[in-house]
Amino acid sequence: MSRKYFGTDGIRGRVGEYPITPDFMLKLGWAAGMAFRKQGHCRVLVGKDTRISGYMFESALEAGLAAAGADVMLLGPMPTPAIAYLTRTFHAQAGIVISASHNPHEDNGIKFFSGQGTKLPDEVELMIEELLDQPMTVVDSSKLGKVSRINDAAGRYIEFCKSSVPSSTSFDGLKLVVDCAHGATYKVAPSVFRELGADVTVLHAQPDGLNINEGCGSTHIESLQAAVLVGHADLGIAFDGDGDRVLMVDHTGAIVDGDELLFIIARDLHDRGKLQGGVVGTLMSNLGLELALKDLDIPFVRAKVGDRYVMAELLEREWLVGGENSGHVVCCNHTTTGDAIIAALQVLMALKRRGETLAQARQALRKCPQVLINVRFGASKVDPLEHPAVKDASAKVTEALAGRGRVLLRKSGTEPLVRVMVEGEDETQVRGHAEALAKLVGEVCV
């Protein structure tokens, strides 16, 4: 059964445009509450990032959940992985995140966690969608849900993050710059690193509801690079608006992406005999990651793009680590979803154990030139991926790469974009192929 509302990462869109409207969120809260109540007494945690529309949608969801008889526990602004963790520790039936991740404040969205802190199973999402098409009813007044606020949510999550670091380990003397993207990590991330001993300079931690991800964070890393160089820091850490993505900058100002961070974490676990299986990447993971892991005899598999698919592959194989080059990194020995702060801590510990700088550690992975071009296709009725001219051109590029590269065309699960990716050994050749394919995709979408 196809989904009407849920994409690869929940429901997302422009605020005020259906379905990102208060009336829909009221109905969604009710439908979710009715679905979760089938498990018995229902308790749902609700958290959000720092965008201004979060207050409006929090109230709407709260009312809908209560109307269905679900008790609601409000977390306030918290990183997405913190909501997953707290859902688990409070033994709730589900957690709801109000966030549009790395998108600007004009967007917002909803995603759900199961009681185990994992992404909601497909069958539950489909049940919620079916309920959304039914008339909304209200339970008897004696069975209405109650609403409370968890005042120590941030402190609980800070202690959880610190517990992932051995008590014998300290980051004394480590000079960090941390970019919080004016987002959900703005309170907890600086506290975690400081309480573990690091000297922390904080950037972009003054959210006003409108500035989340604006020229900062993991999608705009230039100011972090400058701050690392000016402050002579050991490295910089950039989070996205909801705290499930992380990128780093080494002391030279070079960007260290999710593939490189994943390799550093996996190699450290491998060195200590604690890797347990292999590593899960995605179709977008750089070929260099696969080759570097192969040199260490570490198995590598590719999942579909999206951290939910990485997580599903990890669970099926009972492996520990996986991630995306965008900075979603999952460490199943600590978390049930991508957690940017936890991933950053694992990288810092790996560097400390090896006595390496981040710049030295990233040299072990030689990335192949990879060009990614996003092509917007708007309201076009043409499916560019099925167009004969696009399929023929893609096949010809694959043939030209002669087994020494890859071509990938895919639709974004959250935006009206086609992502054109070409990877190979010669950067000039790769860029030429990518630009030609992107131009063709744009032409057939007109």
From Swiss-Prot:
Q: What cellular component GO annotations does this protein have?
A: cytosol
Source taxon at top rank = Bacteria
Q: Name the positions where Mg(2+) binds.
A: S101, D240, D242, D244
Q: How does it get modified after it is made?
A: Activated by phosphorylation.
Q: Which residues carry this modification: Phosphoserine?
A: S101
What's an example of a GO molecular-function annotation for this chain?
Answer: magnesium ion binding
Q: Which residues form the active site?
A: S101
Kindly state what the record says about how the cofactor is bound.
Binds 1 Mg(2+) ion per subunit.
Pfam families tied to this protein: PGM_PMM_I (PF02878), PGM_PMM_II (PF02879), PGM_PMM_III (PF02880), PGM_PMM_IV (PF00408)
In the Enzyme Commission scheme, what number(s) does this protein have? 5.4.2.10
The prosthetic group or cofactor this protein requires is: Mg(2+)
Catalytic activity entry: alpha-D-glucosamine 1-phosphate = D-glucosamine 6-phosphate
Any one Gene Ontology BP term:
carbohydrate metabolic process
Q: Any keyword Phosphoprotein? A: yes
CDD domains assigned: GlmM (cd05802)
| Alphabetical UniProt keywords | Isomerase, Magnesium, Metal-binding, Phosphoprotein
Q: So what does this one do? A: Catalyzes the conversion of glucosamine-6-phosphate to glucosamine-1-phosphate.
The family assignment reads: Belongs to the phosphohexose mutase family.
Quote the protein name from its UniProt record. Answer: Phosphoglucosamine mutase
Species of origin reads Pseudomonas putida (strain GB-1)
Q: What gene name does this entry carry?
A: glmM
